Amino acid sequence: MKIYLKLFGIFGVILLTQISCSSKNYHQPKGQIEKLIPSKYQKNPLTRQSVEITKKTYSFKYKFSSPSNEWFEWSWKYKRLETNEMINKFGISKSIFEPFQATEKNVKSRNRIIKTSLFKKEGNVISPDFNRMIPFYMGFTSPLYALTIRTLGKDSTPRERVEFLLRFVQDIPYGIPPTRSNSKVISGVLSPPQIFIEKWGDCDSKVLLLSSILAHEPRYKILLLHLDKHLLMAFEGRPHPNDAYIIFQGKNLFWQIPPDL
């Protein structure tokens, strides 16, 4: 199936454990993380998600199924205060949406706040900047990429890895985030660390997570598609039979990720 778009902008369980690397960019942890309540929550009862919180660490454990219906359980750890700071990096003060005097100084200050909050401004619209969020959260997703390679092997194909990780994020319970978290506007998006602390996420948040994992391999050419209030993904390459694909700048981008993650 070819799609043309105008673009804007039970079985045994295999256990694998990964200790995540630390991020060299964070030395002054800040704040606590507010517990959020999702709307329209849905969960596959066969999957399992847990997080153990100590003074120093978050210990994550996720059970999910593969495309071949084999069950896996991944576990990994991350420093708690560092993770909190990574979460608190995303989000913008609600005052940025209030009227202001457009002096040169105010405009520069406003633009700086938008950028450092991992948001972007396009015309009169201020929204999360996925292009900056994806590389920013790669430090958190590095253990997930390492677990993918350990699970599938270094000889696995790019498509096999994408399909496997797609099932991983699909088995994360679905829930729509609120517009605010930790006294900041988050526009209904959870950062990758917060997805696992909350143990749920919506479509856009899961696309962000998946993109941040795959970003560890430069060979993945990923295009994010904003369509009907959803964020979808497409990959550059030769489509398989029955794959949905689009034509973008003369290149085939195949295998769109559905909006019902």
List each language-model region with its residue ranges.
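Hydrophobic h-region of N-terminal signal peptides that target proteins for export
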Residues: 12-20
